[in-house]
Amino acid sequence: MPRSNVDAAPFGHYAPRGLCALALRATRRCPTGWLGKRTAFFLRGLALRVLGARPLDVVSLGAPMRLYPQRNVAEKRLAFTPQYFDAPERALLAERLKGEFVFLDVGASVGGYALFAARFGGPRARILAVEPLPEVFERLAYNIGQSGCANVKAVGCALIDVDGEITLFVNPGNQGETSVCIVGAEANARQIKVPGKTLLTLAREEGYERIDAIKLDIEGAEELVLEPFFRDAPRTLRPRLIIMEFTLLPVVATLETRLRSLGYREILRTRENVAYTLAEEEA
């Protein structure tokens, strides 16, 4: 049996202690300005040196999580500075979370967005967290289990343009930069095989009649996922809100042109992400 990537100790066993606890409390109180962030990052660095490879059991964005901040930039942010974790994007999502809201978190990592949406949206919301990297998926599933949120489902696969087994490129320095594309991965990226599905296949398997919002953090593969979906899916399945990682790659510019042609309008752009809404939703 393969070794689990989540420590089996009861939750709370790895609660922050000593210098690490002091640093964590301080970093979470740091403001969002330049000086506040510099201070938070300095204190975080000190805490990480003390912590070593051990995990942390914390509450982040309202959810209990076991985080491994040395392995993944997203987990480092969730542990020490959740106030910096895509705050404008989360606010945009929170405005829309009501009733039987359907949200897909694609490239869910350990559940930051998914668990935020689950807790904010209430028990009637339907949250699907999609994470392809097996070791990160284990941590995602663990965090969902700890949260007690029955409205979140985790799926271990990659989204791509065709159904079938695919190759993932895993950045050894940051598991959050895992991708089906070589773009952005380091030259010594580890390669693994994982199941792949199209977004339309996934939506049909889940029985979705609509998608209220989707977040994509898939390291340059956004066009591979969205273009065949827009081509083949019924209009009623087009997401009302799209939040995706923003890069300067030409493929992203092509995708933005495609989104505008389908009636999407840009409503938010941050240093890392861009968000679009369907114009018909604003009528």
Name the predicted role of every residue range:
Residues M1-A283:
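Phosphate/nucleotide-binding beta-alpha loop and adjacent structural elements of enzyme active sites
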